[in-house]
């Protein structure tokens, strides 16, 4: 079986593997230069300035958030063509009610899609989440008032204050989960009612405890989220660990990482391994959880059934190469990771 993923460092990389083979790395977009050199063209010739978030869209294209140039890019994986779908390239906060491509964004960190194909973008420095309508390409703010802070629980999400939100995840029941990292909380927006609430975290900055109720208890630096049915998977940047929240019971379960920064534990239990500032997380086939272990410059895989962790890409020194086995390739602070639904 062929398996492919996309990860973001300064360039987008793709991994492929057959059952009996090592993972292989290949660049699919970007150059080694971050400067803006155009909105459209062959992906391997277009510069991508600080690509952080990646996601496969409902059209099977790869969507990339370009933090440095405040845009969302679309990579047609069939043709290799790269284009801009949101953001005019200027830093700011404007454009609601108009075309997404004309809007000013401010450090878009992640992109996700709802079941109807509408795009959601979290803007870290605008402290908001915006929605781009699939049919009209109209952009609107759905969470955050543009001011940094903490307020709004129990009220309208558009009137709430967030603090440098980094990651979002969407469930199938109209819920948007937000890694409100500056507030050390995870918040949920009900799309149907427009109401926001905190479902995990507090003002106290320390690691959670295994089996602890999520609401009202600390959760240290939630940086990346992904959702799978009743489970919300969480990477803690300051907490150097991975957690699972049972959304029905509201309980946190420890998955990986001791909470101490470092690099150790491959081949053993993930809970006793060391991570260093993980900033990306994604579920894959075979009950695999993939983690961008950013400050270790590697991608790691957690087997959810066995609880064993392994490194599948990166050798720890920073810098990026391609066309080699995953365990021989150097990465440079990988941030985003995603796995296509069809394994490509």
Language model regions located:
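Bacterial N-terminal signal peptides
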Residues: 4-14
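Conserved beta-propeller blade signature
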Residues: 61-63, 118-120, 175-177, 231-234, ...
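A short loop-to-beta-strand structural motif that recurs across blades of beta-propeller domains
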Residues: 70-74, 81, 127-131, 138, ...
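Residue-level detector of Asp-centered blade-edge/turn motifs that repeat once per structural unit
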Residues: 56-59, 113-116, 170-173, 227-230, ...
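Boundary at the C-terminal end of the N-terminal hydrophobic targeting segment
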Residues: 17-21
């Amino acid at each position: 079986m062929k398996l492919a993923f996309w990860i973001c460092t300064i360039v987008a990389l793709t991994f492929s593997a057959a059952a009996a083979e090592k993972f292989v790395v290949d660049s699919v977009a970007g150059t080694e230069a971050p400067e803006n050199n155009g909105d459209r063209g062959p992906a391997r010739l277009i510069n991508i300035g600080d690509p952080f978030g990646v996601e496969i869209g409902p059209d099977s294209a790869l969507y990339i958030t370009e933090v440095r140039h405040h845009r969302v890019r679309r990579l047609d994986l069939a043709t290799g063509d790269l284009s801009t779908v949101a953001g005019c390239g200027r830093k700011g906060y404007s454009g609601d009610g108009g075309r997404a491509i004309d809007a000013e964004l401010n450090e878009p960190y992640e992109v996700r899609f709802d079941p109807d194909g509408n795009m959601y973008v979290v803007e870290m420095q605008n402290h908001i989440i915006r929605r781009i309508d699939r049919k009209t390409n109209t952009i609107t703010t759905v969470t955050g008032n543009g001011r940094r802070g903490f307020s709004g629980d129990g009220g309208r999400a558009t009137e709430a204050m967030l603090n440098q939100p980094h990651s979002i995840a969407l469930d199938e029941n109209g819920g948007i989960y937000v890694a409100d990292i500056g507030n050390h909380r995870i918040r949920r927006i009900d799309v149907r009612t427009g109401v926001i609430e905190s479902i995990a975290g507090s003002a106290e900055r320390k690691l959670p405890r295994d089996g602890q109720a999520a609401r009202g208890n600390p959760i240290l630096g939630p940086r990346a989220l992904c959702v799978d049915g009743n489970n919300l998977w969480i990477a803690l940047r300051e907490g150097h660990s991975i957690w699972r929240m049972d959304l029905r019971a509201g309980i946190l379960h420890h998955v990986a990482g001791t909470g101490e920064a470092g690099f150790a534990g491959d081949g053993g239990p993930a809970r006793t391994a060391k991570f260093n500032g993980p900033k990306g997380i994604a579920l894959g086939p075979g009950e695999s959880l993939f983690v961008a272990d950013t400050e270790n410059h590697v991608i790691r895989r957690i087997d959810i059934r066995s609880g064993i962790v392994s490194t599948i890409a990166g050798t720890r020194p920073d810098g990026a190469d391609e066309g080699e086995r995953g365990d021989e390739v150097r990465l440079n602070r990988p941030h985003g990771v995603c796995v296509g639904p069809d394994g490509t």
